[in-house]
Amino acid sequence: MAVRKLKPTTPGQRHKIIGTFEEITASVPEKSLVYGKKSSGGRNNEGKMTMRYIGGGHRKVIRIVDFKRNKDGVPAVVKTIEYDPNRSARIALLYYADGEKRYIIAPNGLQVGATLMSGETAAPEIGNTLPLQNIPVGTVIHNIELRPGQGAALVRSAGNFAQLTSREGKYCVIKLPSGEVRQILSTCKATIGSVGNSDHGLERSGKAGRSRWQGRRPRNRGVVMNPVDHPMGGGEGRSSGGHPRSRKGLYAKGLKTRAPKKQSSKYIIERRKK
Protein backbone atom coordinates (compact mmCIF):
# COMPACT_ATOMS: atom_id res chain seq x y z
CA MET A 1 0.00 0.00 0.00
CA ALA A 2 1.21 3.51 -0.82
CA VAL A 3 0.68 6.75 1.07
CA ARG A 4 -0.14 10.22 -0.24
CA LYS A 5 0.85 13.65 1.06
CA LEU A 6 -1.68 16.40 0.56
CA LYS A 7 -1.12 19.99 -0.55
CA PRO A 8 -0.79 22.39 2.42
CA THR A 9 -4.01 24.29 1.69
CA THR A 10 -4.99 24.28 5.39
CA PRO A 11 -3.03 23.74 8.63
CA GLY A 12 -4.65 20.30 9.01
CA GLN A 13 -3.67 19.28 5.47
CA ARG A 14 -0.06 20.51 5.78
CA HIS A 15 1.36 17.56 7.73
CA LYS A 16 -1.25 14.95 6.83
CA ILE A 17 0.04 11.72 5.25
CA ILE A 18 -2.63 9.06 4.73
CA GLY A 19 -3.00 5.78 2.88
CA THR A 20 -4.34 5.56 -0.66
CA PHE A 21 -6.64 2.60 0.12
CA GLU A 22 -6.00 1.42 -3.45
CA GLU A 23 -5.96 -2.25 -2.40
CA ILE A 24 -9.47 -2.11 -0.87
CA THR A 25 -12.00 -3.94 -3.06
CA ALA A 26 -15.16 -3.79 -0.89
CA SER A 27 -16.64 -1.02 1.27
CA VAL A 28 -19.34 -3.03 3.12
CA PRO A 29 -18.27 -5.91 5.42
CA GLU A 30 -19.72 -9.43 5.34
CA LYS A 31 -22.83 -9.18 7.55
CA SER A 32 -22.48 -12.67 9.06
CA LEU A 33 -18.97 -11.88 10.34
CA VAL A 34 -19.58 -8.61 12.21
CA TYR A 35 -21.17 -7.52 15.47
CA GLY A 36 -21.67 -4.21 17.26
CA LYS A 37 -19.96 -3.24 20.47
CA LYS A 38 -20.49 -0.20 22.65
CA SER A 39 -17.40 1.90 23.35
CA SER A 40 -16.30 1.79 27.01
CA GLY A 41 -14.75 5.26 27.07
CA GLY A 42 -12.02 3.83 29.31
CA ARG A 43 -14.54 3.01 32.10
CA ASN A 44 -15.21 -0.34 33.78
CA ASN A 45 -18.52 -1.93 34.81
CA GLU A 46 -18.78 0.46 37.79
CA GLY A 47 -18.34 3.51 35.58
CA LYS A 48 -14.92 4.26 37.05
CA MET A 49 -12.06 5.32 34.81
CA THR A 50 -9.52 2.50 34.41
CA MET A 51 -7.72 3.80 31.30
CA ARG A 52 -7.06 7.47 30.69
CA TYR A 53 -7.10 9.33 27.36
CA ILE A 54 -9.83 7.17 25.77
CA GLY A 55 -13.25 8.44 24.73
CA GLY A 56 -15.42 9.59 21.84
CA GLY A 57 -14.52 8.56 18.32
CA HIS A 58 -16.49 7.14 15.44
CA ARG A 59 -18.63 4.06 16.01
CA LYS A 60 -16.93 0.85 14.95
CA VAL A 61 -18.26 -2.56 13.94
CA ILE A 62 -16.18 -5.51 15.16
CA ARG A 63 -15.03 -7.91 12.43
CA ILE A 64 -14.62 -11.56 13.50
CA VAL A 65 -11.12 -12.48 12.30
CA ASP A 66 -10.01 -16.13 12.10
CA PHE A 67 -6.64 -16.42 13.86
CA LYS A 68 -6.79 -20.23 14.22
CA ARG A 69 -6.96 -21.20 10.51
CA ASN A 70 -8.14 -24.67 11.55
CA LYS A 71 -9.99 -25.67 8.35
CA ASP A 72 -7.15 -27.95 7.27
CA GLY A 73 -7.21 -29.31 3.74
CA VAL A 74 -10.16 -27.15 2.60
CA PRO A 75 -9.20 -24.67 -0.16
CA ALA A 76 -10.42 -21.08 0.11
CA VAL A 77 -10.63 -18.29 -2.49
CA VAL A 78 -9.87 -14.66 -1.60
CA LYS A 79 -13.07 -12.77 -2.40
CA THR A 80 -12.27 -9.24 -1.16
CA ILE A 81 -9.62 -7.17 0.64
CA GLU A 82 -11.25 -4.83 3.17
CA TYR A 83 -10.52 -2.05 5.64
CA ASP A 84 -10.79 -2.90 9.35
CA PRO A 85 -11.10 0.08 11.75
CA ASN A 86 -10.01 -2.08 14.71
CA ARG A 87 -6.48 -2.87 13.49
CA SER A 88 -3.67 -1.41 11.39
CA ALA A 89 -3.62 -4.29 8.88
CA ARG A 90 -6.14 -4.99 6.13
CA ILE A 91 -8.36 -8.08 6.24
CA ALA A 92 -9.26 -10.53 3.48
CA LEU A 93 -12.59 -12.34 3.09
CA LEU A 94 -12.19 -16.05 2.26
CA TYR A 95 -14.84 -18.23 0.61
CA TYR A 96 -14.15 -21.89 1.51
CA ALA A 97 -15.06 -24.76 -0.80
CA ASP A 98 -17.64 -26.04 1.73
CA GLY A 99 -19.46 -22.67 1.71
CA GLU A 100 -18.06 -21.16 4.92
CA LYS A 101 -16.82 -17.55 4.98
CA ARG A 102 -14.02 -16.24 7.20
CA TYR A 103 -11.89 -13.13 7.58
CA ILE A 104 -8.10 -13.36 7.89
CA ILE A 105 -5.29 -10.81 8.23
CA ALA A 106 -4.28 -9.89 4.66
CA PRO A 107 -0.57 -10.60 4.05
CA ASN A 108 1.59 -8.46 1.78
CA GLY A 109 1.08 -9.34 -1.89
CA LEU A 110 -2.22 -11.22 -1.47
CA GLN A 111 -4.50 -10.76 -4.49
CA VAL A 112 -8.24 -11.21 -4.95
CA GLY A 113 -8.89 -14.60 -6.58
CA ALA A 114 -5.90 -16.34 -4.97
CA THR A 115 -6.46 -19.80 -3.47
CA LEU A 116 -5.26 -20.40 0.10
CA MET A 117 -4.86 -23.56 2.17
CA SER A 118 -4.03 -24.45 5.75
CA GLY A 119 -2.72 -27.61 7.38
CA GLU A 120 0.34 -29.86 7.14
CA THR A 121 -0.17 -30.53 3.42
CA ALA A 122 -0.32 -26.83 2.46
CA ALA A 123 2.51 -25.42 0.34
CA PRO A 124 4.73 -22.77 1.98
CA GLU A 125 3.28 -19.93 -0.13
CA ILE A 126 2.02 -16.45 0.81
CA GLY A 127 -1.18 -16.60 2.86
CA ASN A 128 -1.02 -20.34 3.60
CA THR A 129 -0.95 -21.47 7.24
CA LEU A 130 0.96 -24.56 8.33
CA PRO A 131 2.83 -25.92 11.38
CA LEU A 132 6.29 -24.48 11.99
CA GLN A 133 7.80 -27.96 11.50
CA ASN A 134 6.62 -27.88 7.85
CA ILE A 135 7.98 -24.39 7.08
CA PRO A 136 11.47 -24.12 5.50
CA VAL A 137 14.20 -22.46 7.60
CA GLY A 138 14.68 -18.79 6.69
CA THR A 139 11.04 -18.22 5.70
CA VAL A 140 9.35 -14.91 6.59
CA ILE A 141 6.20 -15.57 8.65
CA HIS A 142 3.47 -13.82 10.67
CA ASN A 143 0.37 -14.75 12.75
CA ILE A 144 2.36 -17.10 15.01
CA GLU A 145 0.79 -19.26 17.72
CA LEU A 146 2.38 -19.63 21.16
CA ARG A 147 0.43 -22.80 21.98
CA PRO A 148 -0.92 -25.35 19.46
CA GLY A 149 -4.55 -24.58 18.61
CA GLN A 150 -4.63 -21.35 20.64
CA GLY A 151 -4.74 -19.06 17.62
CA ALA A 152 -2.20 -16.51 16.42
CA ALA A 153 -0.85 -14.27 19.17
CA LEU A 154 2.36 -12.81 17.69
CA VAL A 155 3.19 -10.62 14.66
CA ARG A 156 -0.27 -9.41 13.63
CA SER A 157 0.09 -5.64 13.04
CA ALA A 158 0.67 -3.87 9.72
CA GLY A 159 4.02 -4.43 8.01
CA ASN A 160 5.38 -6.80 10.65
CA PHE A 161 7.12 -10.12 10.04
CA ALA A 162 9.20 -12.71 11.90
CA GLN A 163 11.75 -15.20 10.58
CA LEU A 164 12.17 -18.90 11.26
CA THR A 165 15.93 -19.16 11.85
CA SER A 166 16.54 -22.77 12.98
CA ARG A 167 15.15 -25.89 14.67
CA GLU A 168 16.18 -27.37 18.03
CA GLY A 169 14.48 -30.67 18.85
CA LYS A 170 10.74 -30.15 19.21
CA TYR A 171 11.14 -26.36 19.12
CA CYS A 172 11.68 -23.84 16.33
CA VAL A 173 13.75 -20.69 16.88
CA ILE A 174 11.96 -17.53 15.74
CA LYS A 175 13.35 -14.01 15.43
CA LEU A 176 10.52 -11.58 16.27
CA PRO A 177 10.10 -7.96 15.05
CA SER A 178 11.19 -6.63 18.46
CA GLY A 179 14.58 -8.34 18.04
CA GLU A 180 13.70 -11.05 20.56
CA VAL A 181 14.80 -14.57 19.62
CA ARG A 182 12.73 -17.31 21.24
CA GLN A 183 11.75 -20.96 20.98
CA ILE A 184 8.22 -21.95 19.95
CA LEU A 185 6.82 -25.49 19.70
CA SER A 186 7.13 -26.92 16.19
CA THR A 187 3.46 -27.95 16.21
CA CYS A 188 2.33 -24.31 16.49
CA LYS A 189 1.00 -22.78 13.28
CA ALA A 190 2.17 -19.67 11.42
CA THR A 191 1.21 -17.95 8.18
CA ILE A 192 3.68 -17.44 5.32
CA GLY A 193 4.65 -13.88 4.37
CA SER A 194 4.58 -10.51 6.10
CA VAL A 195 1.51 -8.56 7.22
CA GLY A 196 0.17 -6.17 4.58
CA ASN A 197 -0.29 -2.38 4.70
CA SER A 198 3.45 -2.02 5.26
CA ASP A 199 3.42 1.79 4.81
CA HIS A 200 1.16 2.27 7.83
CA GLY A 201 4.11 3.53 9.89
CA LEU A 202 4.56 6.48 7.49
CA GLU A 203 1.05 7.84 8.11
CA ARG A 204 0.60 11.12 10.00
CA SER A 205 -2.71 12.36 11.34
CA GLY A 206 -2.03 16.04 10.50
CA LYS A 207 -4.40 17.44 13.12
CA ALA A 208 -5.75 16.76 16.59
CA GLY A 209 -9.25 16.20 15.24
CA ARG A 210 -8.25 13.05 13.38
CA SER A 211 -7.00 11.56 16.66
CA ARG A 212 -10.36 12.40 18.25
CA TRP A 213 -12.16 10.62 15.40
CA GLN A 214 -10.18 7.52 16.40
CA GLY A 215 -11.20 7.81 20.06
CA ARG A 216 -7.89 9.18 21.36
CA ARG A 217 -8.13 12.06 23.84
CA PRO A 218 -5.33 14.56 24.63
CA ARG A 219 -2.53 13.08 26.73
CA ASN A 220 -1.34 15.43 29.49
CA ARG A 221 2.24 15.47 30.77
CA GLY A 222 2.70 14.59 34.43
CA VAL A 223 4.93 17.61 35.05
CA VAL A 224 2.05 20.05 34.40
CA MET A 225 -0.32 18.29 36.84
CA ASN A 226 -0.83 18.91 40.54
CA PRO A 227 0.95 16.73 43.15
CA VAL A 228 -2.34 14.95 43.90
CA ASP A 229 -2.56 13.78 40.27
CA HIS A 230 1.00 12.70 39.47
CA PRO A 231 4.35 12.10 41.26
CA MET A 232 5.99 14.65 38.93
CA GLY A 233 3.35 17.33 39.52
CA GLY A 234 3.56 20.54 41.53
CA GLY A 235 6.47 22.86 42.22
CA GLU A 236 6.91 26.62 41.90
CA GLY A 237 6.80 27.83 38.31
CA ARG A 238 8.13 25.53 35.63
CA SER A 239 9.91 22.71 37.44
CA SER A 240 11.51 19.55 36.08
CA GLY A 241 9.44 17.21 38.25
CA GLY A 242 12.50 15.31 39.46
CA HIS A 243 13.31 11.79 38.31
CA PRO A 244 10.87 10.64 35.58
CA ARG A 245 8.20 8.40 37.08
CA SER A 246 4.98 6.79 35.97
CA ARG A 247 1.61 7.76 37.36
CA LYS A 248 1.97 4.94 39.92
CA GLY A 249 5.34 6.23 41.11
CA LEU A 250 7.56 3.67 39.35
CA TYR A 251 10.70 4.86 37.57
CA ALA A 252 9.77 5.52 33.94
CA LYS A 253 13.23 5.18 32.37
CA GLY A 254 14.84 1.74 32.23
CA LEU A 255 12.92 -0.04 35.00
CA LYS A 256 12.39 -3.69 34.00
CA THR A 257 8.70 -4.56 34.20
CA ARG A 258 8.88 -8.26 33.22
CA ALA A 259 8.29 -10.65 36.14
CA PRO A 260 11.70 -12.13 37.12
CA LYS A 261 10.35 -15.68 37.63
CA LYS A 262 8.05 -15.78 34.61
CA GLN A 263 7.70 -19.36 33.34
CA SER A 264 8.19 -18.51 29.66
CA SER A 265 11.58 -16.83 30.23
CA LYS A 266 13.32 -20.18 29.64
CA TYR A 267 12.19 -20.10 26.00
CA ILE A 268 13.74 -16.69 25.32
CA ILE A 269 17.23 -17.05 23.84
CA GLU A 270 17.87 -13.34 23.29
CA ARG A 271 15.91 -10.52 24.93
CA ARG A 272 14.23 -7.88 22.81
CA LYS A 273 16.12 -4.73 21.89
CA LYS A 274 15.25 -1.58 23.85
From Swiss-Prot:
According to its record, what are the GO cellular component terms? large ribosomal subunit
Tell me the InterPro entries matching this sequence: NA-bd_OB-fold, Rib_uL2_dom2, Ribosomal_uL2, Ribosomal_uL2_bac/org-type, Ribosomal_uL2_C, Ribosomal_uL2_CS, Ribosomal_uL2_dom3, Ribosomal_uL2_RNA-bd_dom
Question: Which residue windows does the record flag with biased composition (Basic residues)?
Answer: 207-220, 244-264
Q: Which Pfam families match?
A: Ribosomal_L2, Ribosomal_L2_C
Region annotation (Disordered) maps to 195-274
Q: Name one GO biological process term.
A: cytoplasmic translation
Q: Is Ribonucleoprotein among this UniProt entry's keywords?
A: yes
Per UniProt, the keywords (alphabetical) are:
Ribonucleoprotein, Ribosomal protein, RNA-binding, rRNA-binding
Q: Which GO terms describe its molecular function?
A: RNA binding; rRNA binding; structural constituent of ribosome; transferase activity
The entry sums up its family as follows: Belongs to the universal ribosomal protein uL2 family.
Question: Which HAMAP family does the record cross-reference, listed alphabetically?
Answer: Ribosomal_uL2_B (MF_01320_B)
Q: How does it assemble?
A: Part of the 50S ribosomal subunit. Forms a bridge to the 30S subunit in the 70S ribosome.
Q: Could you identify this protein by its name? A: Large ribosomal subunit protein uL2
What species was this sequence derived from?
Bacteroides thetaiotaomicron (strain ATCC 29148 / DSM 2079 / JCM 5827 / CCUG 10774 / NCTC 10582 / VPI-5482 / E50)
